[in-house]
UniProtKB/Swiss-Prot annotation:
Binds 2 Zn(2+) or Co(2+) ions per subunit. Homodimer. GO terms for molecular function: acetylornithine deacetylase activity; cobalt ion binding; succinyl-diaminopimelate desuccinylase activity; zinc ion binding. The lineage of its organism: Bacteria, Pseudomonadati, Pseudomonadota, Alphaproteobacteria, Acetobacterales. This is Succinyl-diaminopimelate desuccinylase. The keyword Coiled coil does not apply. It comes from the Bacteria. Pathway: Amino-acid biosynthesis; L-lysine biosynthesis via DAP pathway; LL-2,6-diaminopimelate from (S)-tetrahydrodipicolinate (succinylase route): step 3/3. NCBIfam families: dapE_proteo, PRK13009.1.
Length: 383
C-alpha cells in the first residue's frame, strides 16, 4: 500500500481558503503527472480546477474521483497548532482540510500509485470552488467533460461521510436546498398613531405561519420528510415606540426527491402572496434532491459501483456500510447529471472545526479501501 501521509501534509500546508489555491493544485497535479496521468488545467474566473486521466493497458470501466482542494477559513478560535502546518501529533494529522477533504484526495492518489497497471480508466475531477459559491468549479468542469466526451461510468466524491468510524456510511444521495428571502414593506410611524402608519409585520407573520404549519410530505424510502426552517426574522428596529417600515425573513427548505426546486418555489410564492401581496420574494435553489439507488438507478455503473465500494469497505474495515442520504449538499448534486455518483471519505467529526484532524491510520485504511475499489470496479477482482 502506498502511504498518503506526505501528500496529505503537503496539501495541508497550502492555505487554500476559497477562492485561493495557494499552490495546492500544483502539488496535486505534480503527483499525478509523476504517475502517468494527463492533467488538463481548467481555470474559470479566479478558480483553479483540473481534470486528470490515466488509461490502463486493458479495456474496462471509467471510474472518476471528485474532490476539492479549497477549505473554509480556520476561524477566530485559537488552534492547538498552526492550522496550515500539517503537523502529526500522537498519530493524528491536524490541519484545515485534514478530513474535508485533502486527506481523502491524498488517499485516492496513493491508491492510484499502488495500481499502475489497472484495467479501464481512472480520472480525477478537482475543483477549488466547493466551499464557496460553486459557480466556477465542478459545474464548469462538468460542462467541459460533456463537450470533450469524458463521461465516467461511476464517480466517488471524497467527502467525509462517516460520523464516527471509517466505513460506517456511503452517501448515495442528498436532499435539495432552497433559500428564500421575504421582504414586506410598509410605512414607518409612531405606535400611538397606527392609522398614520402601515405595519408590515402582521402580513409577514401571517405568511410565515402559513409556511411553517404546512407539512410538505411524509418522507420517502431513504429520505426524511422535507423541512422548512426559518433562519432570520428582522425589522432593524430597536425602538419600542416605532412601527417599522420594513420586515424581512429568511428561510431554507431541505427537500427530498418528492419535490423539484421550481415547484417548491411556486408553492412558496403562492402562500406568501396570499398573505402579503406586496412582498418581494427572492429565491435561490442551490441544488436538487437526488439519489443513486443501487436497485432502481437504470445506469449500469450505479449498482456495480456501489457493490464494489461496499466490498472494498468490508475488506479493509470489516464493516458493512449503510447507505444514507442525510447531511448537507455537496458537488455530487451536480455530478449526478453526468453519471452515477456516491460519496465516501474520512470521518467528518471535526470538519470545519478548530483543530480539524484525521487519524493517520484512517488515511492509510482509506487508501486501502480506494485500492480495493479500483480492483473490484475496474476488473482486477470481480464484484
Amino acid at each position: 500500500m502506498s502511504d498518503p501521509l506526505a501528500l496529505a501534509q503537503a496539501l495541508l500546508r497550502c492555505p487554500s481558503v476559497t477562492p485561493l489555491d495557494a499552490g495546492a493544485q500544483s502539488v496535486l497535479a505534480e503527483a499525478l503527472t509523476a504517475q502517468g496521468f494527463t492533467v488538463t488545467q481548467l481555470p474559470f474566473g479566479d478558480i483553479a480546477n483540473f481534470y486528470a486521466k490515466r488509461v490502463g493497458p486493458r479495456s474496462g470501466p471509467h471510474l472518476c474521483f471528485a474532490g476539492h482542494t479549497d477549505v473554509v477559513p480556520p476561524g477566530d478560535a485559537p488552534w492547538s497548532v498552526d492550522a496550515f502546518a500539517g503537523e502529526v501529533h500522537d498519530g493524528v494529522l491536524i490541519g484545515r482540510g485534514a478530513c474535508d477533504m485533502k486527506g481523502a484526495i491524498a488517499s485516492f492518489v496513493a491508491a492510484c500509485a499502488a495500481r499502475p497497471d489497472h484495467p479501464g480508466t481512472i480520472s480525477l475531477l478537482i475543483t477549488g470552488d466547493e466551499e464557496g459559491v460553486a459557480t466556477d468549479g465542478t459545474v464548469r468542469v462538468l460542462d467541459w467533460m460533456r463537450q470533450a466526451g469524458e463521461i465516467p461510468d461511476f464517480c466517488v466524491v471524497g467527502e467525509p461521510t462517516n460520523p464516527g468510524r471509517l466505513g460506517e456510511v456511503i452517501k448515495i444521495g442528498r436532499r435539495g436546498s432552497l433559500n428564500a428571502t421575504l421582504t414586506v414593506r410598509g410605512r414607518q410611524g409612531h405606535v400611538a398613531y397606527p392609522h398614520r402608519a402601515d405595519n408590515p409585520l402582521p402580513r409577514l407573520v401571517a405568511a410565515l405561519h402559513a409556511l411553517t404549519t404546512t407539512r410538505l410530505d411524509d418522507g420517502m424510502e431513504g429520505f426524511e420528510p422535507s423541512s422548512l426552517q426559518l433562519t432570520t426574522v428582522d425589522v432593524g428596529n430597536p425602538a419600542t415606540n416605532v412601527i417599522p417600515e420594513q420586515a424581512q425573513a429568511r428561510l431554507n427548505i431541505r427537500f427530498n426527491p418528492l419535490h423539484r426546486g421550481d415547484d417548491l418555489a411556486r408553492w412558496l410564492r403562492g402562500i406568501v402572496q396570499d398573505h402579503a401581496p406586496d412582498a418581494v420574494i427572492d429565491i435561490a435553489i442551490s441544488g436538487e434532491a437526488f439519489v443513486t439507488d443501487p436497485d432502481r438507478d437504470p445506469r449500469p455503473g450505479a449498482s456495480h459501483g456501489i457493490a464494489a465500494l461496499r466490498m472494498a469497505i468490508q475488506r479493509i474495515t470489516g464493516l458493512s456500510p449503510r447507505l444514507d442520504t442525510g447531511g448537507g449538499t455537496s458537488d455530487a448534486r451536480f455530478i449526478t447529471h453526468l453519471c452515477p455518483v456516491v460519496e465516501f471519505g474520512l470521518v467528518g467529526a471535526t470538519m470545519h472545526q478548530r483543530d480539524e484532524a484525521v487519524a493517520v491510520r484512517d488515511l492509510q485504511d482509506l487508501t486501502g479501501i480506494y485500492e480495493a475499489l479500483l480492483d473490484f470496479y475496474l476488473g482486477k477482482d470481480s464484484a
